[in-house]
Amino acid sequence: MKFDTVIMGGGLAGLLCGLELQKHGLRCAIVTRGQSALHFSSGSLDLLSTLPDGQPVTNITEGLNALREQAPTHPYTTIGASAVLELAQQAQALLEASGAHLQGDVQQSHQRVTPLGTLRATWLSSPEVPVWPLAAQRICVVGISGLLDFQAHLAAASLRQHHLTVETAEIDLPELDVLRDNPTEFRAVNIARLLDNEEKWPLLHDALLPIAKTCDMIIMPACFGLADDSLWRWLNERLPCSLNLLPTLPPSVPGIRLHNRLQRQFVRQGGIWMPGDEVKKVTCRNGVVSEVWTRNHADIPLRPRFAVLASGSFFSSGLVAERDGIREPIMGLDVQQTATRAEWYQRDFFDAQPWQQFGVTTDDALRPSLAGQTVENLFAIGSVLGGFDPIAQGCGGGVCAVSALHAARHIAERAGGQQ
């Protein structure tokens, strides 16, 4: 099977890269093993929140310039500050065109409220997520009886520190009793599958209405809206106060919705989606990828002109930690890591951990190397890259989006518009 590009990994980076390549008329296939990290994320994307020295980023242009000095191996430094800003704008437009209507601006980050009621700087977030400053003084944080993935009292306690009047309440929906037999089934995603049924909408409205009459804003867990935000908009039109939603513990409804929208758009535009499959081997001859072998296709290789590695970090098994080092399991690519195992971590759990910055090494075009030799038609994108800390620096989603479009640009230029 011949393709212009085979993308190994179906997360945020892989999907955005595929969508961008489709705009240039290239035939793409995505091989994905299972659920991506998006399913376990908040659905919000960070661009750059904090510099390596701990300074918060308030001006993205100045932040990128400072990052170049402090983190010379960061993917943003590799790509270049001006290109990062341009590609971030393109990524935002691509998300919008795919049906993911997110709020935010490249030049100015905003503060979103987290599930614990704290504030976190972010680039893009779902419109139902509350953004600081809140347009209300009297707030009620509402939980659902029996849902352990959201603690209303913790969120309320944090919000009270900002001199707001915050109360808590709990609603009981007997229609959800079918899920209560097994506590592991009483999760936000399973609740959403029931509540997204239009016949159930009035039941949720009736449960929230008495609370809505006593406050200016309701904040509750994001336990509906797997396909779209129709129910959220419907409730906001009918309740006497505004309604905002906070992501729960994983799996996350906003994260799943974002992934599903991108995946459906990729398939709608003619992309080949290979779910439940896994790349087992990549044939590389004279520094060029010629064949990609997957578990399900056995002795039938995929033959791409270009290949993209978007396999994720440790969470997605794109990187594997062993006693003597970190390795990239598909091809054994060169990995940026510390010399000894003792340097992998800091003893304080809440400190920035060095292992978070481990990943494959690349050139300026994001082409990785194998035994010191650059692989000419292979590009690495997303969390598999080294040189950045997605948690401490608040740049995980941004690196995925920007690196995906940077690689897609180089592939499109090399392909020359020829399929």
Swiss-Prot record:
Native organism is: Citrobacter koseri (strain ATCC BAA-895 / CDC 4225-83 / SGSC4696)
Q: What class of enzyme is it?
A: oxidoreductase
The pathway it acts in is: Polyol metabolism; glycerol degradation via glycerol kinase pathway; glycerone phosphate from sn-glycerol 3-phosphate (anaerobic route): step 1/1
Keywords associated with the record: Flavoprotein, FMN, Oxidoreductase
Question: Which reactions appear under catalytic activity for this entry?
Answer: a quinone + sn-glycerol 3-phosphate = dihydroxyacetone phosphate + a quinol
Q: Which GO cellular component terms are attached?
A: glycerol-3-phosphate dehydrogenase (FAD) complex
GO-annotated biological processes:
anaerobic respiration; glycerol catabolic process; glycerol-3-phosphate catabolic process
Question: Under which EC number(s) is this enzyme classified?
Answer: 1.1.5.3
Xref: Gene3D superfamilies: FAD/NAD(P)-binding domain (3.50.50.60)
Please list the GO terms describing molecular function. glycerol-3-phosphate dehydrogenase (quinone) activity
Q: Coding gene? A: glpB
What is the recorded name of this protein?
Anaerobic glycerol-3-phosphate dehydrogenase subunit B
How is this protein organized at the quaternary level?
Composed of a catalytic GlpA/B dimer and of membrane bound GlpC.
* InterPro entries in UniProt: FAD-dep_OxRdtase_2_FAD-bd (IPR003953), FAD-oxidoreductase_2 (IPR050315), FAD/NAD-bd_sf (IPR036188), G3P_DH_GlpB_su (IPR009158)
- Which cysteines does the record link by disulfide bonds? none
List the Pfam families.
FAD_binding_2
- The organism's place on the tree of life at top rank: Bacteria
Per its Swiss-Prot or TrEMBL entry, what cofactor is needed?
A: FMN
Query: What is the stated purpose of this protein?
Result: Conversion of glycerol 3-phosphate to dihydroxyacetone. Uses fumarate or nitrate as electron acceptor.
Name the protein family.
Belongs to the anaerobic G-3-P dehydrogenase subunit B family.
Q: Does the keyword Flavoprotein apply?
A: yes
